[in-house]
Amino acid sequence: MAAELHVELVAADRSVWSGEATLVVARTTSGDIGVMPGHQPLLGVLESGPVTIRTSEGGTVIAAVHGGFISFADDKLSLLAEIAELADEIDVERAERALELAKSDADAAAQRRADVRLRAVAVR
């Protein structure tokens, strides 16, 4: 069993994060899943939510992910998201305004996106 896994977090428009990790936690349609080196191969559908990546250097990377797929085999993990952004990139005030606007417009999808962004920031 390898001591680390290679992770690629990719959004539709860009590569968000790439590197070595010891653990990745993501939300799928079947529930939260933690992937460590040596995990059984998997393919799943990502739900909107924060993704936590524990890097090999001991750091933590948090990203807000909005839908997509997760794939793991041979200690290579791919997170292919419709939309993804690192928690450090999220403007909290803008996300809070977007959440309030979505609530007033009764826009459930926009409300869910803003909520995920704020949860990702809260986790970091």
From Swiss-Prot:
<keyword id="KW-0066">ATP synthesis</keyword>
<comment type="function">
    <text>Produces ATP from ADP in the presence of a proton gradient across the membrane.</text>
</comment>
<keyword id="KW-0472">Membrane</keyword>
<dbReference type="InterPro" id="IPR020546">
    <property type="entry name" value="ATP_synth_F1_dsu/esu_N"/>
</dbReference>
<dbReference type="GO" id="GO:0045259">
    <property type="term" value="C:proton-transporting ATP synthase complex"/>
</dbReference>
<keyword id="KW-1003">Cell membrane</keyword>
<dbReference type="Pfam" id="PF02823">
    <property type="entry name" value="ATP-synt_DE_N"/>
</dbReference>
<keyword id="KW-0406">Ion transport</keyword>
<dbReference type="InterPro" id="IPR001469">
    <property type="entry name" value="ATP_synth_F1_dsu/esu"/>
</dbReference>
<dbReference type="GO" id="GO:0005524">
    <property type="term" value="F:ATP binding"/>
</dbReference>
<keyword id="KW-0813">Transport</keyword>
<comment type="subunit">
    <text>F-type ATPases have 2 components, CF(1) - the catalytic core - and CF(0) - the membrane proton channel. CF(1) has five subunits: alpha(3), beta(3), gamma(1), delta(1), epsilon(1). CF(0) has three main subunits: a, b and c.</text>
</comment>
<protein>
    <recommendedName>
        <fullName>ATP synthase epsilon chain</fullName>
    </recommendedName>
</protein>
<dbReference type="GO" id="GO:0046933">
    <property type="term" value="F:proton-transporting ATP synthase activity, rotational mechanism"/>
</dbReference>
<keyword id="KW-0139">CF(1)</keyword>
<comment type="similarity">
    <text>Belongs to the ATPase epsilon chain family.</text>
</comment>
<dbReference type="InterPro" id="IPR036771">
    <property type="entry name" value="ATPsynth_dsu/esu_N"/>
</dbReference>
<keyword id="KW-0375">Hydrogen ion transport</keyword>
<dbReference type="GO" id="GO:0005886">
    <property type="term" value="C:plasma membrane"/>
</dbReference>
